[in-house]
A protein has these predicted regions:
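Amphipathic, Lys/Arg-enriched alpha-helical "gate/interface" segment within cytosolic domains
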Residues: 2-121
Length: 121
């Protein structure tokens, strides 16, 4: 399940994922939020917390993540992935060189540093 997080500027898509993440999470939560931010801002930022209760992601959701990332590819200014899930951290680090903006992975213990970084000028 994915939910939106409060306390971030409008250009930051701030989400938290836990349990099993589905295509419906992307279609009903993530994609509408990205589209709304993209209508108002030239550049976008993403803050994505993946909780300790993360139980996996459906292949269709992974595809939606990839697709929406590519659709707005040039607009991603910063991406912060906050996770202790090793394979997610490795995947983000492996693909970050493809992103035009800055991408960082933070452990869950550094959430506050990740939040500060994603909102910094």
């Amino acid at each position: 399940m994915i939910r939106l997080l409060d306390g971030f500027p409008d250009n930051v898509i701030a989400i938290s994922g836990g349990g099993r993440i589905s295509r419906e999470d992307y279609e009903n939560v993530v994609i509408p939020r990205i589209e709304a931010a993209a209508r108002q801002h030239r550049t976008l930022r993403c803050y994505y917390e993946i909780g300790a209760d993360f139980a996996g992601i459906d292949p269709a959701a992974l595809w939606d993540d990839f697709r929406v990332g590519i659709e707005y590819w040039r607009r991603w200014e910063r991406v912060a992935a906050v996770t202790d899930v090793a394979w997610i951290a490795q995947m983000v680090n492996a693909f970050r060189f493809l992103m035009p903006g800055q991408v960082r992975v933070f452990p869950n213990s550094d959430k506050e540093a990740a939040r500060a970084w994603i909102m910094a000028d």
